[in-house]
């Protein structure tokens, strides 16, 4: 079934940004930086901030044009900024880890579920496993060629999955630093991968327009799930999604077909993919059937638009897609005929949509990153940006990870930015 829409409710999300290195004010008796309030896409209020050291533990921040800045006395990396009845919590990195002496550019990163180990991939085809506490390198993983665009841990925290522009995926022992297997089958660079259950099976997506279901123990392809004419940019595997989708949306059911004995945990799972062609697709992992293709037709248009979707996610009853023009579309998974909402805070591409911490005080919230260096926490009940992670100066966010009340950001440089004690997660 192909979905479309003629009218989509639109909400612009105002936000405040402050100079990326604002926290350096604490190292000087006085300092100046800039602050900006984006009221909508065309109107921005620019202000300047002057900081003054009162004593060893207290600083005063003064500004113009209606800005009010309130530093957190218990956490110098946190400051609240207000303007025009709008308020946002902004965090600076607690620490910044510079990898390989600043000689490498980070293209991807993952963190273990306990937050003790991290792994980053770079443009030279290598990955390095490091301790998140001090940045000490534990293992170097060498075997890819070209940019490593995927780096993630399995739930055990002992196994790493990587994918590169060389079209291959690799499974690594994070402790020993050895490559356990290589998955070969794509003919374009790897863009995304999602584990099925605990990780006996996985789904990979590529610039070749295909998504594949793999059996990891045998390094073999179980099924070719999709074949598009342009790249697949992101993927997400959801559980229990099929229970909410009307049965009429599923076509050409293969329920009577014999299930491949290599499949583990695919029953009840749905794959969501974000396509360069400008749509999302939902695919039943067990039957391999497409459940729905979620297109966007703007009011007054006669055909679907072709703006690329770069990111996708499933949150509560929402299927969410972020596109190349900065729009974030929401579908109700019980009705995929059309998006029920479009949010926007930038014209830059949306690159990541992630769940908030499972222990969050703000349950109905998601993290979103963009190509101009923004990393925001969105409160979906209020349609409001409530938290911002500073530290990247208008460059693309290449990876975002959240573990507990900690977050990790990377850009196209050699710095891993680590944030701690975030209030809203």
Swiss-Prot record:
Entry superkingdom: Eukaryota
Matches recorded under InterPro entries: G-protein_beta_WD-40_rep (IPR020472), WD40/YVTN_repeat-like_dom_sf (IPR015943), WD40_repeat_CS (IPR019775), WD40_repeat_dom_sf (IPR036322), WD40_rpt (IPR001680), WD_repeat_multifunction (IPR051179)
Signal peptide, first to last residue: none
Pfam families referenced in this protein's UniProt entry, alphabetically: WD40
GO annotations of cellular component type: proteasome complex
Repeat (WD) residue spans along the chain: 101-140, 143-182, 185-224, 299-341, 345-382
Biological role stated in the UniProt entry: Inhibits proteasome 26S assembly and activity by impairing the association of the 19S regulatory complex with the 20S core.
Family assignment from sequence similarity: Belongs to the WD repeat PAAF1/RPN14 family.
The protein's name in its UniProt record: Probable proteasomal ATPase-associated factor 1
Species classification: Eukaryota, Amoebozoa, Evosea, Eumycetozoa, Dictyostelia
Gene assigned in the entry: paaf1
